[in-house]
Amino acid sequence: MLLYICLVNLLLPLSVGAASGAALGVIAKVGVDAALQQIDDVWKGKTVRYWKCAVENRSSKTLYALGTTQESGSMTTVFADIPPKSTGVFVWEKSRGAAKGAVGVVHYKYGNKVLNIMASIPYDWNLYKAWANVHLSDHKESFSDLYKGKNGAKYPTRAGNWGEVDGTKFFLTEKSHAEFKVIFSG
């Protein structure tokens, strides 16, 4: 108990960075020893979370790379346009040394619309689940709207299940090194 109180006093002042609320959640859920090991792994940069995504463009138009919305982590590969009848691949990785997952949105321009692709791979699988969503809209969608199913976006699909929305089928595996398959038909 004394160790827990010391950790709380140590971690609470950290408003940004390696620990904060996520570490406290780990302590409460998995116990002090496991929490200390996870915190140590984060500080040493050993914890890896990412999603690699293959976007298959089955439409007759090019998907133009429009940018990303970073929630946690960033794209670690080249973000390129995807011609018709082609597949583009990229990797989104969590930030090193942060107790956060690999979370964000990738945007492609499709004609006068925007294809928004969201994935959320949690840092702590004991507390959170992986989710994915896709939405074709008139503008770039925020992570929050896609994650919460707001402003015209459908509620996200939990990893391990096929989702289908706006002419797009998608599947996200439920693991730390997730694979995300997106099939866009336009």
From Swiss-Prot:
One of its GO terms (molecular function) is channel activity. Expressed female germline during oogenesis. Residues 29-48 are annotated as: N-terminal region. The keyword Transmembrane applies. Changing Y147A: Important decrease in cytolytic and loss in hemolytic activity. Loss of binding to sulfatide, lysophosphatidic acid and sphingosine-1-phosphate. Pore-forming protein that forms hydrophilic pores and causes cytolysis. Compared to equinatoxin-2 (AC P61914), it reveals lower cytolysis activity (5-12-fold difference, tested on erythrocytes), a larger pore size (probably 2-3 nm) and different affinity to membrane lipids (100-fold lower affinity to sphingomyelin). Binds to sulfatides (SFT) as well as to the two sphingolipids, lysophosphatidic acid (LPA) and sphingosine-1-phosphate (S1P). It seems to bind more strongly to LPA than to S1P and SFT. This is Hydra actinoporin-like toxin 1. GO terms for cellular component: extracellular region; nematocyst; other organism cell membrane; pore complex. PANTHER family: BRYOPORIN. It holds the Pfam family Anemone_cytotox. Composed of a long N-terminal alpha-helix and a core region rich in beta-sheet structures. Before the pore formation, the alpha-helix binds the lipid membrane, partitions into the lipid-water interface and stabilizes the monomeric molecule on the membrane. Finally, it traverses the bilayer, thus forming the transmembrane pore. It is found in: Nematocyst; Secreted; Target cell membrane. A motif (Cell attachment site, crucial for protein stability) lies at residues 158-160. Its main location: other. GO terms for biological process: cytolysis in another organism; monoatomic cation transport; pore complex assembly.
